[in-house]
Amino acid sequence: MAKVHFIGIGGSGLSAIARLLLESGHTVTGSDRVLSPFAVDLQKAGATVYIGHHPRYITGADWVVRSSAIPDDNPEVQAALAANIPVYKRADFLGQLMADKTGIAVAGTHGKTTTTAMIAWVLTELKRNPSFIIGSGMKNLGVNARAGKGNVFVIEADEYDRMFLGLRPRIEIVTNLEHDHPDCYPTFEDMLTAFESFVDLLPADGTLIVCADDKGTAPLITHARRAGKAVVGYALQSDMTINSPNWIQARGLKLNTLGGFSFNVASNLSGGLSSVSVDLQVPGEHNVRNALAALAVVELLGLSTQKAARALASFSGTGRRFELRGEAKGVTIIDDYAHHPTEIMATLAAARTRYPGRRICAVWQPHTYSRTQILFAEFSRAFKDADEVIVSEVYASREAKQDFTSAEVVSAMPHASARFIATLQEISQYLIDHLQPSDVLLVLSAGDADQVSADVLAGLKKR
């Protein structure tokens, strides 16, 4: 067994790979700026995690894996190269991990994490014992990765830094396509080109499963067909525009007592028309689409859709994806990772469905200057389903601080109850002072605003 050192081990991507290697019997060490919850979990699982970066941390490593956020001049990268230790980027290392398994890669602008988790959960329940890597912890199993004994490997395929082009899956899912990551893809056409290259990676016996009622995927479907790839389209019946010999669709959506949708699924993937009923507890029409993608995978693998439907009914979601953090003083507090206008609108719509008639207060922490400025107009219009909107200052993430404030987005909002409060601490105190019984607090952030949920929950209990 090898000793593998991870630079940036606390992130969702590298922490998942590290867990996979730990479960496979390898020795794992890693370093990061801070000790994240993912890193704490890895310590409990047997990894050695260092805070900060130093050349001595790579001592004895057989391989080094670096996050895409780690620069070339990182002291551990430099020390590894000087010692002739192989240094891999995440994408290249993942490709090697998947080489001997049937790879299922989930890509797209929105819904990757939940769809990946649904597929992994269903295959686990169907006794296929899959390996998987997810961008967040799956609630049903409490982990974001697992080294399974089966021959299937399910992975969330991140398009940032073109990471997904290092994978070699046999089944690809593309949930939707919208312009995102402008620091990596200046235009939608740049991003589409990367996704076309992703589709080109499919082998002769591979299949593209794609949401066919998403406008952004239309050129990708055209490209896949011209390249001779097998294509399966999935869609809601109300939006059905599939012109494909292979399809799966949801019909008769109805709200259920679990808080999600119940619906019937029709498909022609098994050689003739088939149908199955599904009852979801995760809310929103977007999760119906995610479930369709999971069922398409099940059919392609020749497994029981009836058993898969039962597994989907027990699927409880992933961390920070419409995650109920708690209730206090009659206030319901929910965390969500939404950081793109379309994701925000879908999450607010799901909240309206789950909590009809209740006042919804949305807290949004903009994620990166580039995304906030490129999608400025879209963000300003994304909050129509919220009764009150509170916007913090931008979370810069990997970007340098800029002469821009998200107060400008608030000024452009047509919303009557939108306000800018710069710091998370000030936002938490405002909410503790002003939230009322029956309010729903929805915290939308891909940064560190989940601390608002924890602080407000604790503060309300003391109020």
What are these regions (language model features)?
Residues 20-26, 43-44, 57, 68-212, ...:
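Phosphate-binding loop of NTP-binding sites
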Residues 2-5, 13, 17-24, 171, ...:
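Nucleotide phosphate-binding/pyrophosphate-handling subdomain across enzymes
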Residues 26-33, 208-212, 361-365, 385-395:
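Short internal beta-strands
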Residues 1-93, 215, 252-254, 283, ...:
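N-terminal leader/targeting and accessory segments in enzymes
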Residues 29-32, 50-53, 88-92, 133-136, ...:
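Beta-strand->loop->alpha-helix junctions that form or flank phosphate-binding loops
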Residues 6, 30, 132, 172, ...:
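Structural beta-sheet core signal
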Residues 380-437:
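C-terminal helical cap/extension that packs against the catalytic core
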Residues 4-6, 64, 104, 130, ...:
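Conserved hydrophobic helix-helix packing surfaces used for dimerization/oligomerization
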